[in-house]
From Swiss-Prot:
One of its GO terms (biological process) is positive regulation of SREBP signaling pathway. Residues 1-41, 227-256 are annotated as: Disordered. The keyword Iron does not apply. Its main location: nucleus. Disulfide bonds: none annotated. It comes from Candida dubliniensis (strain CD36 / ATCC MYA-646 / CBS 7987 / NCPF 3949 / NRRL Y-17841) (Yeast). Belongs to the ETT1 family. Required for correct translation termination and probably involved in regulation of hypoxic gene expression. It is found in: Nucleus. The lineage of its organism: Eukaryota, Fungi, Dikarya, Ascomycota, Saccharomycotina. One of its GO terms (cellular component) is nucleus. This is Enhancer of translation termination 1. Pfam families: Nro1 (PF12753). Residues 233-252 have a biased composition (Acidic residues).
Amino acid sequence: MAKRTLGLAKAAKAKKQKKEQVHQESSDEESSSENQLTIELPEEIDANDEISQLKGLHKTYLESERDNELLVNGLIHECDRLLRENDTENKSPLPPVFHAIYATALAELSKFHTEELDKVKEYFTAALERVELGLQQNPNDITLLVTKTKILLDQISLQYIAPLTLESDTKELDREIDELLDATLSVYESVEARAKELNDYSIFDDFETLDILEALDDILDIVDNFGRKNQGDDDSDENDDDDEDEEEESVELSENHPLYKIKNSDKYDQWWRDHTHLYLDNLEKLENGSSELKREVCQRLGQSYLQESEVPYSVFTTLKYDDEYDGIEELEGLTEKQAQEISQELITKALDYLKRAKDEEDPETWVGIAEAMISLGNLYEVDSKQQDDLYVEAEKILKKANNVTNGKFKEELDNLLYKE
């Protein structure tokens, strides 16, 4: 599998922006109400059940922009209160979901203090201690295992990777980051194993669980782009010339750098692909699994195959059509024929998943299918039946999408008609 061809993090972040600097000093007028928080809980929450209320408060946070530190502190204070009350009144042990919410809230605090490494460490230490306490009382609880995986991935990003520079050395860390990542992925594998053991795959019918795979992809994307001048800068000048972009992408890490092993290994990209496939398999075992979630997983798989096809696709089109490469037999270790066959196989796989990701209410998903068809058509001989059939089908899809969106996809349609 080609190195870091699965980079879906940027697309995912466009849907779900993780804000790091959101807690700012309020004005004098606002400060008087800063310690007051009124939350309207979902209707289905039992007002007489304190754990149910805690779950409702947590759900409110999850469905928000997740930029309110006051709400996170509210969760923690409520957990502290329930814990004290439970200890005082000698009630039955608190359920696993309590420990999961408590640990998650503690870890979330780190995102509001990313410039204060000591606090980040403190929050993650407390979060992991809480989740381990929960697991001691509820061994192999699947919700707690999911929570632990998510916290560990966040810890890798914020505590271990965020402070690094190009000059960082593995000797500066108490643990090697690839070892931490291996241990974290092992916890997630225990989630999969536990679901299989219980024959209950409902844990996967939740975008919060799918976030684990997105968080891993985010980490791999950060590692792949580590050291680039505009890394993580969404406001960078889009008019930078291509030569400068190429120079930025060529940043090399020393063998002693904490991210060197991850950056120079294919295994984490392959792990992401394999376990995303397994995620989809587990979803399909549910009678009433979320259609939206299935489409999202299929979309990610389709995009991953498209991205993996980029290098062989470029090799094929260059060797076949670029006069400057006349007489050259190979590029990137591939002949024209090999590049063509590999690209056709990958884009065909991508099309299968993109079709399964199609949403009748979202023309963007239709256009994704059409664009993949055009790419596949480009890999066949000019004016061949295979190419013509793919172009004709893509044109139908683009015309339909263009009509229902009042011309939003006119450029894509015009480009295809120009090819024809």
